[in-house]
Curated annotation (Swiss-Prot):
Region described as 3-hydroxyacyl-CoA dehydrogenase: spans on this chain: 311-729
Protein residues bound to NAD(+): 324, 343, 400-402, 407, 429, 453
GO molecular function per UniProt: 3-hydroxybutyryl-CoA epimerase activity; delta(3)-delta(2)-enoyl-CoA isomerase activity; enoyl-CoA hydratase activity; long-chain-3-hydroxyacyl-CoA dehydrogenase activity; NAD+ binding
GO (cellular component) term, any one: fatty acid beta-oxidation multienzyme complex
Lineage: Bacteria, Pseudomonadati, Pseudomonadota, Gammaproteobacteria, Enterobacterales
Matches recorded under PROSITE patterns: 3HCDH, ENOYL_COA_HYDRATASE
Protein's job: Involved in the aerobic and anaerobic degradation of long-chain fatty acids via beta-oxidation cycle. Catalyzes the formation of 3-oxoacyl-CoA from enoyl-CoA via L-3-hydroxyacyl-CoA. It can also use D-3-hydroxyacyl-CoA and cis-3-enoyl-CoA as substrate.
Region of interest (Enoyl-CoA hydratase/isomerase), residue spans: 1-189
The protein's name in its UniProt record: Fatty acid oxidation complex subunit alpha
C-alpha cells in the first residue's frame, strides 16, 4: 500500500496504474477538511512515483462522495476571512496538484458526486459513471458557491450556459443528462465501472486518447467571444434576479464570479472564486440555509430513530374525501401504501378521486410516469360509502369537517369497525387531540396527524401526541408520514398545536395594524418583499379562507383567552360578515379571477376599503421596520412559549415546522435562527417598544432571562481549526 489515511487509501493496481479509493468509516464518503488534507498527502506520495503511468479514483461506498461535510460549515464560517481564504487556497492547491499529475487520471463515479465530490472529479481528465449517478453543485442552496474550483472548471468543460444553469440553481443531474452535456465521458453498468475506467485509462496511457488535450481547456480562459459572453451572462443574471431575488446573494455572486473569471486562466480564476466565496460564507443567509440543512437532517434522523422498532403501515384509510381527503389518499398511494377512502356521499368520493386523478395526470404530463404506472397507483385507492375493508387497515386518518361533535362521532363509529391494534388519527388543524380522544374506548391508539394544504406540495406533517397517545401509536403514524415522503414533527397537544398556535398571533398582529390605520396592501408588500414571506398576511388569509380563519380564531381565543381573546371587531370579522371568504368564492381582501391556466389571480377591489374603514382608525402610514416588528413579535413570542411549555421539543424542530409548514423565509432559517441572528437582547429591546399593544407583545420570562446575557437558542458554535498546512497555501 502506498498510503493509508482515515478516509482514503492509495495502492498500486497494475503496470504503473495506481488507485485512490475513498473509503470513510460509516456509510458515506464526505469531503471534510481532514479528507482534503489526506488527499493532499496521498497526491504527495503519487508525485514521488517515477514509474506512475495513470491514476484511477473510485469509492468503496454506494455513493462516490456525497459532498462536503456540512456539519463542519457553521464552525468553518466563523473562521476569520483571511484564515478561511488561506485554507481554501490550500484545498485548491490539492485539487490543482491532482489535475497537474503528469499522467492521465480518471474518476469511476457511482451514485452521488455532489458539491466537493463533483469538484473533486472535475479535476480528473476523464469521468466514467454508473446509471444511478447524481452529480452537481448544490452550494448556492446553502447560501454559498463552489469553493473547490467548481465555478472555474465546470464552465470551461461544459460551456458557460450549461455550467451556469447547474451552479446558479444549485442543481444536480442524472447520468443521461451528465453524458449529454459532457460532465461525464461515459455511462456503464455498476459491475463494469472499474473495468471500463481501466480500459479508458489504458487507451490514454497508450496514446489512443489525447488526455493532455482533454485537460488543457480547464487551465485556460473560457472560450467565449465578447458577444457570446454578453448574451450568456446577461441572460443568466436576469434569470437569477427573477428566481432568487435580493434575499439570496449566492446565485448572483456565482454568476458574476464566473463572468469576471472568464478571461483568466486557472490560477487567477481560482483567486476570484476564493474572493467571492469567503464573504458569502460569512453572511447570515449562509448560516441560516446551512442551519436548515442541518435541522432537516436532525428532524429526519429523529423520525428514523423513533420508528426503528415499528413496522410501516401497509394499508391505510382516509375518512372524508374531498380535496384534502383526496390529497392524502393520492400521497399515500403514490408512495406505495394502498388506501381506502370513505365518505358518506358519492359527490365527495367523486371529488376525492378526481383530485387524486388530477395529481397523477400532472405527473403523466411531466413525463414522470407512464399510463401503466398511473393506472397502477389509482387502482390502490378504493373509494367506499361503507366500512368494507376497514378490518384490514393499519392506520386511519380522519379528515372530516372541522367540528368537534362531527369528528368525535365519526372517530367513535370507526373505532368499532377496525382491529384493536389499528391506529386512528385526526387531521384537525386546531381542536385539541385529548378532547377528541374522550369519545374513544382506546385513546392510547389515537393521535393527531395535521397535513397542510396542498398535501402533495407541503412537506410538513404535524404529529400530535394526546395525553393518552402511546409511543407505539406515535411511531406508527410517524412511519406512515415518512413513507409518504413527508417530514413528520411530533408536538404535544394544545389548541392549534404548534403551527396554527403561532400563526394566529401573527394574524392578530396584522388585525391590530389594520385597526390602527395601516393599509393591508403595504403590509403584504413589506412582509413579502422585505421580510421574505411567500405571501403577505392578507393574501395568506385569502388562500387559507377567511371563514376558516374566522372559525380557527375563535377556537384559539377559547384556548388562550388571556392573549388571543379580542374585544373588538376586526378585519377578519368584517370580511366574514360580508361573505368574502377569500379565493374559494373569489372575494377576500383581494378580488380573484382565473387566469389563462385556470389559477386564481388577485386584483384590487375598492369595496374592501369601505368594509375595513368600519373597523379601523383613519388611514396612516407605518414604516417598514414597524410593520415587520408588529407582525413578527407576536409570532416569535408564541414560538418561544411553545418551546418553554414543551409543545415543541427543540429550536431545530420549531424552525423546520415554520419553514415547511408556513413558508417562513428560508434565508432567515426559522424563528429561533432569526432570533439568534438578531440577538435576544436586541429582540427584547425591540419588543418592549410595543408591549403597550397587549399581551401578545409581552416577551416570555424565559426569553427575558436569556436576553440579560444575550444568550442564543441554538448551542454556540466554536470557530473551526481546519486541517491543512496553511503555510503551503
Amino acid at each position: 500500500m502506498l498510503y493509508k489515511g482515515d478516509t482514503l487509501y492509495l495502492d498500486w493496481l497494475e503496470d504503473g496504474i495506481a488507485e485512490l479509493v475513498f473509503d470513510a468509516p460509516g456509510s458515506v464518503n464526505k469531503l471534510d477538511t481532514a479528507t482534503v488534507a489526506s488527499l493532499g498527502e496521498a497526491i504527495g506520495v503519487l508525485e514521488q512515483q517515477s514509474d506512475l503511468k495513470g491514476l484511477l479514483l473510485r469509492s468503496n461506498k454506494a455513493a462516490f462522495i456525497v459532498g462536503a461535510d456540512i456539519t463542519e460549515f457553521l464552525s468553518l464560517f466563523l473562521v476569520p476571512e483571511e484564515q478561511l481564504s488561506q485554507w481554501l487556497h490550500f484545498a485548491n492547491s490539492v485539487f490543482n496538484r491532482l489535475e497537474d499529475l503528469p499522467v492521465p487520471t480518471i474518476a469511476a463515479v457511482n451514485g452521488y458526486a455532489l458539491g466537493g465530490g463533483c469538484e473533486c472529479v472535475l479535476a480528473t481528465d476523464y469521468r466514467l459513471a454508473t446509471p444511478d449517478l447524481r452529480i452537481g453543485l448544490p452550494e448556492t442552496k446553502l447560501g454559498i458557491m463552489p469553493g473547490f474550483g467548481g465555478s472555474v472548471r465546470m464552465p470551461r468543460m461544459l460551456g458557460a450556459d450549461s455550467a451556469l444553469e447547474i451552479i446558479a440553481a444549485g442543481k444536480d443531474v442524472g447520468a443521461d443528462q451528465a453524458l449529454k452535456i459532457g460532465l461525464v465521458d461515459g455511462v456503464v453498468k455498476a459491475e463494469k465501472l472499474v473495468e471500463g475506467a481501466m480500459a479508458i485509462l489504458r487507451q490514454a496511457i497508450n496514446g489512443d486518447l489525447d488526455w493532455k488535450a482533454k485537460r488543457q481547456p480547464k487551465l485556460e480562459p473560457l472560450k467565449l467571444s465578447k458577444i457570446e459572453a454578453a448574451m450568456s451572462f446577461t441572460i443568466a443574471k436576469g434569470m437569477v434576479a427573477q428566481t432568487a431575488g435580493k434575499h439570496y446573494p449566492a446565485p448572483i455572486t456565482a454568476v458574476k464570479t464566473i463572468e469576471a473569471a472568464a478571461r483568466f486562466g486557472r490560477e487567477e480564476a481560482l483567486n476570484l472564486e476564493n474572493k467571492s466565496f469567503v464573504p458569502l460564507a460569512h453572511t447570515n443567509e449562509a448560516r441560516a440555509l446551512v442551519g436548515i440543512f442541518l435541522n432537516d437532517q436532525y428532524v429526519k434522523g429523529k423520525a428514523k430513530k423513533l420508528t426503528k422498532d415499528v413496522e410501516t403501515p401497509k394499508q391505510a384509510a382516509v375518512l372524508g374525501a374531498g380535496i384534502m381527503g383526496g390529497g392524502i389518499a393520492y400521497q399515500s398511494a403514490w408512495k406505495g401504501v394502498p388506501v381506502v377512502m370513505k365518505d358518506i356521499n358519492d359527490k365527495s368520493l367523486t371529488l376525492g378521486m378526481t383530485e387524486a386523478a388530477k395529481l397523477l395526470n400532472k405527473q403523466l404530463e411531466r413525463g414522470k410516469i407512464d399510463g401503466l404506472k398511473l393506472a397502477g397507483v389509482i387502482s390502490t385507492i378504493h373509494p367506499t360509502l361503507d366500512y368494507a375493508g376497514f378490518d384490514r387497515v393499519d392506520v386511519v386518518v380522519e379528515a372530516v369537517v372541522e367540528n368537534p361533535k362531527v369528528k368525535k362521532a365519526v372517530l367513535a363509529e370507526t373505532e368499532q369497525k377496525v382491529r384493536p391494534d389499528t391506529v386512528l388519527a385526526s387531521n384537525t388543524s386546531t381542536i385539541p387531540i385529548s378532547e377528541l380522544a374522550n369519545a374513544l374506548e382506546r385513546p392510547e391508539n389515537f393521535c393527531g396527524m395535521h397535513f397542510f394544504n396542498p398535501v402533495h406540495r407541503m412537506p410538513l406533517v404535524e404529529i400530535i401526541r394526546g395525553e393518552k397517545s402511546s409511543d407505539e401509536t406515535i411511531a406508527k403514524v410517524v412511519a406512515w408520514a415518512s413513507k409518504m415522503g413527508k417530514t413528520p414533527i411530533v408536538v404535544n397537544d394544545c389548541p392549534g398545536f404548534f403551527v396554527n398556535r403561532v400563526l394566529f398571533p401573527y394574524f392578530a398582529g396584522f388585525s391590530q395594524l389594520l385597526r390602527d390605520g395601516a393599509d393591508f396592501r403595504k403590509i403584504d408588500k413589506v412582509m413579502e418583499k422585505q421580510f421574505g414571506w411567500p405571501m403577505g398576511p392578507a393574501y395568506l388569509l385569502d388562500v387559507v379562507g377567511i371563514d376558516t380563519a374566522h372559525h380557527a380564531q375563535a377556537v384559539m381565543a377559547a384556548g388562550f383567552p388571556q392573549r388571543m381573546q379580542k374585544d373588538y371587531r376586526d378585519a377578519i370579522d368584517a370580511l366574514f360578515n360580508a361573505n368574502r371568504f377569500g379565493q374559494k368564492n373569489g372575494l377576500g381582501f383581494w378580488r380573484y379571477k382565473e387566469d389563462s391556466k385556470g389559477k386564481p389571480k388577485k386584483e384590487e377591489d375598492v369595496v374592501v376599503d369601505d368594509l375595513l374603514a368600519k373597523v379601523s382608525q383613519p388611514k396612516r402610514d407605518f414604516s417598514e421596520e414597524e410593520i415587520i416588528a408588529r407582525m413578527m413579535i407576536p409570532m416569535v413570542n408564541e414560538v418561544v412559549r411553545c418551546l418553554e411549555e414543551g409543545i415543541i421539543a427543540t429550536p431545530a424542530e420549531a424552525d423546520m415546522a415554520l419553514v415547511y409548514g408556513l413558508g417562513f423565509p428560508p434565508f432567515h432559517g426559522g424563528a429561533f435562527r432569526w432570533l439568534d441572528t438578531l440577538g435576544s437582547a436586541k429582540y427584547l429591546d425591540m419588543a418592549q417598544q410595543y408591549q403597550h399593544l397587549g399581551p401578545l407583545y409581552e416577551v416570555p420570562e424565559g426569553m427575558r432571562n436569556k436576553a440579560r446575557h444575550n444568550e442564543p437558542y441554538y448551542p454556540p458554535v466554536e470557530p473551526a481549526r481546519p486541517v491543512g498546512d496553511l503555510k503551503t497555501a
